């Protein structure tokens, strides 16, 4: 616990420093800096409070041990031993809690997300599975009390999606859905398969934290905006005016096209939200190669061999290959009952990070 104790003291020192900074009139006048420092202060508060509890109970243990060495009073000895046992139990519990609190936090965990789902290998069946995944996440979001907004979609003639982009807003969305990044494989008999053979198809899911103004500052001069006429599905509702928008962030080359809404203004607003998130995602990676790898990890190539999870319909089975978890309740999972998988992934992630913390 000694190494952990040193880390905790450093956290407490930083917390004190932050409290001084956010009381400084110069910092208060700079709203972006004040927001950033206040957020950091808030993220450390629980750890510091637990650490203060830990120091207090450790002092109680020390005092009780000293008292037991010095007293000859039987009643006092009995009372002190009882208090000491309780204090040691509390100390052990606080040590466990502090270890978890010291696990490096993902700064994006509290953010809303942009989710991109794409039909990949498997043609029409892959696009139908992309639609099934969309419905699965929609139902899960409803259970969580989150709001889902479709910001872009490209539908197929069979009722699936070549791709669909969602904005999901609510409490700690990224912390729960970030593990959905990757290729999702489905094994089932397609509705178009007359012989009843099981086919394997893939859809990919990409999850990006929504960038806040404090995260990324895009100079308007760095954005090129092109407008064009949107094309409705199958010639339906084709807009005769130039309402579709394509935004290019010149320094990074990131392009976002948006034609989901009827008005250019609405498409501009949605395109900017996605562009900000992609640029933020880009700048989180210091090198171009690291960024490319992250985007590849997030969106996936769609190759059938690259998978994080398999959905086997004939056997009503879902397997998450990263943690070796198999659940025989595919019907419930596709209805949005994702808690068991997501909680298992969070525990596995925390366990790995805790092991790294202990080995540092």
UniProtKB/Swiss-Prot annotation:
The keyword Endoplasmic reticulum is assigned to this record: no
Annotated positions of the N5-methylglutamine modification: 236
Signal peptide feature range: none
SUPFAM superfamilies assigned to the protein according to its UniProt record, in alphabetical order: Release factor (SSF75620)
Main location: cytoplasm
Places the protein is found: Cytoplasm
Molecular function terms from GO: translation release factor activity, codon specific
Record-linked InterPro entries: PCRF, Pep_chain_release_fac_I, Pep_chain_release_fac_I_sf, Prokaryotic/Mito_RF, RF-1
PTM remark: Methylated by PrmC. Methylation increases the termination efficiency of RF1.
Domain of life: Bacteria
Alphabetically ordered keywords of this record: Cytoplasm, Methylation, Protein biosynthesis
Similarity comment: family membership: Belongs to the prokaryotic/mitochondrial release factor family.
Cited function: Peptide chain release factor 1 directs the termination of translation in response to the peptide chain termination codons UAG and UAA.
UniProt protein name: Peptide chain release factor 1
Source organism (scientific name): Limosilactobacillus reuteri subsp. reuteri (strain JCM 1112)
Gene, per the UniProt record: prfA
């Amino acid at each position: 616990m000694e190494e952990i104790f040193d880390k905790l003291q450093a956290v407490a020192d930083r917390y004190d420093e932050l409290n001084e900074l956010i009381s400084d009139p110069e910092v208060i006048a700079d709203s972006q800096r004040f927001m950033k420092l206040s957020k950091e202060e808030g993220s450390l508060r629980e750890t510091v409070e637990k650490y203060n509890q830990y120091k207090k109970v450790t002092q109680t243990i020390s005092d009780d041990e000293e008292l037991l060495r010095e007293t000859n009073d039987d009643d006092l000895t009995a009372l002190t031993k009882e208090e000491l046992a309780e204090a040691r139990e509390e100390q052990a519990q606080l040590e466990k809690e502090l270890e978890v609190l010291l696990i490096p936090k993902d700064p994006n965990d509290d953010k809303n997300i942009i989710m991109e789902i794409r039909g990949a290998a498997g043609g029409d069946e892959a696009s139908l599975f992309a639609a099934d995944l969309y419905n699965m996440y929609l139902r899960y979001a409803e259970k969580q009390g989150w709001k889902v907004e479709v910001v872009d979609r490209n539908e197929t003639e069979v009722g699936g999606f070549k791709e669909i982009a969602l904005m999901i807003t609510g409490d700690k969305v990224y912390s729960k859905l970030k593990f959905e990044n990757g290729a999702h494989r489905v094994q089932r008999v397609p509705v178009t398969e007359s012989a009843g053979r099981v086919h394997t198809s893939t859809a990919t899911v990409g999850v990006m934290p929504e960038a806040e103004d404090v995260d990324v500052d895009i100079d308007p001069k760095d954005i090129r905006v092109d407008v064009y006429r949107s094309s409705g599905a199958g010639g339906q509702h084709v807009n005769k005016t130039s309402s579709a928008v394509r935004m290019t962030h010149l320094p990074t080359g990131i392009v976002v096209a948006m034609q989901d809404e009827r008005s250019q203004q609405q498409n501009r607003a949605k395109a900017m939200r996605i562009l900000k998130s992609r640029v933020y995602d880009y700048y989180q990676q210091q090198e171009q190669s690291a960024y490319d790898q992250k985007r590849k990890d997030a969106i996936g190539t769609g190759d059938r061999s690259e998978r994080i999870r398999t959905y086997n319909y004939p056997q009503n089975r879902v397997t998450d290959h990263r943690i070796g978890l198999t659940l025989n309740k595919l019907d419930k999972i596709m209805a949005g009952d994702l808690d068991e998988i997501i909680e298992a992934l969070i525990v596995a992630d925390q366990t790995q990070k805790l092991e790294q913390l202990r080995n540092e």
